């Protein structure tokens, strides 16, 4: 299987006419399916996709790695553009998120159409050769910057972790 990954938005910019922001959004094209990995902090990924000639209406899955605003800030914008993609994420995506003491989570989660969400709790194959891993243990906390990020769950602060996808290609 051949996979093409196109950066729609991230911190640096190398394409003429494109813009960057603190955030991430990648388009993953397997040839059979299109997956959007995160939505950046705003609708900027949509503008960059238009410049690159990418039709986001053709995306089959939106995979949200975690609930921080720089990865989910464009969620509402994407759902307005694409009416078919299944949104894949951990159930904890909507728990309150913080960076230090500042709120940093999904904006207006109550306004979202919950029927489009697929919550994953274990390793799941989304489409042929593409997997999501919702629970990855942190083996070396000193090698991360997670000490600044936490979620509020079960009545207490907890470390905030991510969802990862991989393929056999």
Model-derived regions, located:
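Active-site metal-binding motif and surrounding structural segment of the metallo-beta-lactamase
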Residues: 44-92
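Divalent metal-coordination and catalytic microenvironments
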Residues: 28, 38, 49, 66, ...
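Short, glycine/charged-enriched secondary-structure capping and boundary segments
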Residues: 20-22, 51-52, 77-79, 101-104
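Zn-dependent metallo-beta-lactamase
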Residues: 1-32, 127-163
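Flexible, acidic/histidine-containing loops and adjacent segments that form or flank the divalent-metal
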Residues: 85-102, 106-155
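Active-site metal-binding loops of divalent metal-dependent hydrolases
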Residues: 10-11, 39-42, 67, 92-93, ...
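Pre-active-site segment of Zn-dependent metallo-hydrolases
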Residues: 18-19, 33-61, 151-153
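Conserved small/polar residues in nucleotide/adenosyl-binding loops
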Residues: 165-169
């Amino acid at each position: 299987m051949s996979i093409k990954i196109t950066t729609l938005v991230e911190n640096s910019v190398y394409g003429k006419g494109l813009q960057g922001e603190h955030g991430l959004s990648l388009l993953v094209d397997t040839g059979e399916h299109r997956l959007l990995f995160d939505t950046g902090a705003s609708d900027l990924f949509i503008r960059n996709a238009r410049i690159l000639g990418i039709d986001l209406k053709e995306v089959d899955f939106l995979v949200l790695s975690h609930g921080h605003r720089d990865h989910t800030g464009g969620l509402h914008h994407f759902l307005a553009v694409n009416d078919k993609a299944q949104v894949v994420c951990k159930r904890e995506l909507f728990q309150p998120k913080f960076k230090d003491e500042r709120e940093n989570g999904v904006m207006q989660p109550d306004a979202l159409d919950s029927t489009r969400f697929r919550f994953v709790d274990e390793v799941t194959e989304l489409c042929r050769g593409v997997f999501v891993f919702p629970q990855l243990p942190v083996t070396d906390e000193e090698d991360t910057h997670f000490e600044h990020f936490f979620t509020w769950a079960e009545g207490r602060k907890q470390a905030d972790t991510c969802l990862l996808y991989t393929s056999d290609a």
